Swiss-Prot record:
PANTHER family: LARVAL/PUPAL CUTICLE PROTEIN H1C-LIKE PROTEIN-RELATED, PUPAL CUTICLE PROTEIN C1B-LIKE PROTEIN
Repeat in keyword set: yes
Keyword Repeat belongs to the record: yes
Entry note about domains: The tetrapeptide (A-A-P-[AV]) repeats found throughout the protein are also present in many proteins constituting the protective envelope of other species.
Sequence repeat residue numbers: 7-10, 68-71, 75-78, 93-95, 105-108, 121-124
Function: Component of the cuticle of migratory locust which contains more than 100 different structural proteins.
Keywords: Cuticle, Repeat
Name of this chain's protein: Cuticle protein 76
Organism encoding this protein: Locusta migratoria (Migratory locust)
GO MF term list: structural constituent of cuticle
Length: 139
């Protein structure tokens, strides 16, 4: 009998299965300053295929230079207290047979000074500072 519809063909027509090529590249570089006091190191790598693309980069900066900067000191807080002002009355003398009371004077209370240190929320005062030989960053 005839088995043409059920058997595999003897020849296969068409292109062979080929994986498309991938393109890759990588680079590294180190730039050093005079006397090797500071350096910038870079590394990058890329892989590209017809279906995807991936890149990675790493950049590192080091600075071992000695740099002297004056220390900044905050000014001392100033607190001011107003003087306590009072008014004293004299007591009149009672008749000889009477009882003389001393005038009552309330204790003088001075107004307190201002708080010596002002506190803020942490995110409002958080900052970063970097100082190098030729660069300074702060925020």
């Amino acid at each position: 009998g005839y088995l043409g519809g059920y058997a595999a063909p003897a020849l296969a027509y068409g292109a062979a299965a080929v994986a498309p090529a991938a393109i890759t590249s990588q680079q590294s570089n180190i730039l050093r300053s005079y006397g090797n006091l500071g350096q910038v190191s870079t590394y990058s790598k890329t892989v590209d295929t017809p279906y995807s693309s991936v890149s990675k980069a790493d950049i590192r900066v080091t600075n071992n230079a000695v740099y002297a900067a004056p220390a900044a000191y905050a000014a001392a807080p100033v607190a001011y207290a107003a003087p306590a002002l009072g008014y004293a009355r004299t007591a009149l003398a009672a008749p000889a047979l009477g009882y003389a009371r001393a005038a009552y004077a309330a204790p003088a209370v001075a107004a307190g000074g201002l708080l010596g240190v002002a506190y803020s929320a942490a995110p409002a005062v958080a900052h970063l500072t970097y100082s190098g030989l030729h660069a300074a960053y702060a925020y």
